[in-house]
C-alpha cells in the first residue's frame, strides 16, 4: 500500500530537518519556571507537512521509533543549555516499546552525552 507523503517523510528524516522548541512549564503557585516541554518542529523549507503529519506517516510506514529517536536526540542536545535543575519533559509514544527497532536506554545514554542529568528528565 502506498502511503501518502511517505517520500516527503523519508526526505525529512534523511535531512534530519527537525528542530526542538521548548515550552516553559510554570509552577502556578510561585510563577517560577519548573522545566521545559520539548516539542518538535519541522524545518518547513521544502515541505507542507506538519509535525503531527510526520507521526501519522511514521505509524503507517513502521518508523515511529526512527522519528522519535531523531526528535529526542535533537531535544536532548539542545537541552544542554537549559537552566540547571530545570526539568526537561519529553513526549513519548506509549507504544514505542513495541517497535522492534526500539533501543532501551537510548534516552539515558544520549542525555549523558549531552550533559543533561537523567534526574532532570520527565517522560
Where are these regions (language model features)?
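Active-site core of bacterial EAL-family cyclic-dinucleotide phosphodiesterase domains
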Residues: 2-57
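Short, flexible active-site loop motifs that bind/organize anionic cofactors or intermediates
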Residues: 21, 62, 111
